[in-house]
Amino acid sequence: MNIHEYQAKALLHEFGVPISKGVPVLRPEDADAAAKTLGGPVWVVKSQIHAGGRGKGKFKEASAGDKGGVRLAKSIDEVNTFARQMLGATLVTVQTGPDGKQVNRLYIEDGSDIDKEFYLSLLVDRETSKVAFVVSTEGGVNIEDVAHETPEKIVTFSVDPATGVMGHHGRAVAKALKLSGDLAKQAEKLTTQLYNAFVAKDMAMLEINPLVVTKQGQLRVLDAKVSFDSNALFKHPEVVALRDETEEDAKEIEASKYDLNYVALDGTIGCMVNGAGLAMATMDIIKLYGMEPANFLDVGGGASKEKVAAAFKIITADPNVKGILVNIFGGIMKCDVIAEGVVAAVKEVGLKVPLVVRLEGTNVDLGKKIISESGLNVLPADNLDDAAQKIVKAVKGG
């Protein structure tokens, strides 16, 4: 689960992390009061969407002006103008895709007198089962570009959760950022604060880009991006309360109601599979035969008929789907339950695209019988390779 920048900063501030003062704004008429509360003389008006690259992004609407999604204002009148232009407009960035995202919230923040910009992030390193720090002197830019062009400027190290963050970790951050004296002490303190927030809130990723040194000699978090481990949200109702469903894919929201593992993709072949490994293999073989999957969908091992029907309806709700591949290897998940769910869903919503079904495992004969006697126009497949070839051929009109 992701949250907005202003929410991330408020959360980090609870752990003592230094941030600039700011006020979230949902209506243009509230911008004036927000700016006056902060005092100025310089304000930063920031679009709040779940995507990076906001500063270099462009709005679709001409009425939003030709500036990006993060704007510097030198008067309250300018703050008000930017708020009117940006709220409700569609911002396109390198991470939103061509459709962009509508800006429904702004964050008006005190301007900072910046001397240096750095990069600092924490994430879960699944290979080592530790929390990894990624640190670079190259802040304010895409860290992927830095990794590609000048990888020597990125320093990484891990913290063992059994011992937690220690003094030498903070010193490692200060050294990587080439800080000394009081700034080094600030970096050591910040390292502990960020780690404590990361662990306490069960974050999956915490990215500070940029972390700045002001001309007054203070470290400050200028932008923050936070993702949480969805499996731990039941422990954090205060985090769940921050969720903004308008920033999420409607199909993914619907899938979460049925505890389905669903991720929308950009392809045209919808997939319904049981098991994450088999789902990834199914997506790979679709790509092998020259097409792209429209989604990742794992119905899990104990799905009911109703859950399977819901999954099928979510797939068919995607207008980009031109064909559907159901690939089930029945263990705990029984093939007849899958068949009943698919038949029920098709009878309810109709079937306007080719459907290939490959069933194997528990109750496979009963599952195949249910589908064959349903009267539906379903293409059966004997194995995964056969299934992939059939759905690709059907979608291409072969």
UniProtKB/Swiss-Prot annotation:
Keywords: ATP-binding, Ligase, Magnesium, Metal-binding, Nucleotide-binding, Tricarboxylic acid cycle. Mg(2+) binds at N209, D223. It catalyses: succinate + ATP + CoA = succinyl-CoA + ADP + phosphate; GTP + succinate + CoA = succinyl-CoA + GDP + phosphate. One of its GO terms (molecular function) is succinate-CoA ligase (GDP-forming) activity. One of its GO terms (biological process) is succinyl-CoA metabolic process. Binds 1 Mg(2+) ion per subunit. GO terms for cellular component: cytosol; succinate-CoA ligase complex. ATP binds at K46, G53, R54, G55, E109, S112, E117. Pathway: Carbohydrate metabolism; tricarboxylic acid cycle; succinate from succinyl-CoA (ligase route): step 1/1. Its cofactor is Mg(2+). Residues 9-254 form the ATP-grasp domain. Gene3D superfamilies: ATP-grasp fold, A domain, ATP-grasp fold, B domain, Succinyl-CoA synthetase domains. Belongs to the succinate/malate CoA ligase beta subunit family. This is Succinate--CoA ligase [ADP-forming] subunit beta. It comes from Bradyrhizobium sp. (strain ORS 278). The lineage of its organism: Bacteria, Pseudomonadati, Pseudomonadota, Alphaproteobacteria, Hyphomicrobiales. The gene is sucC.
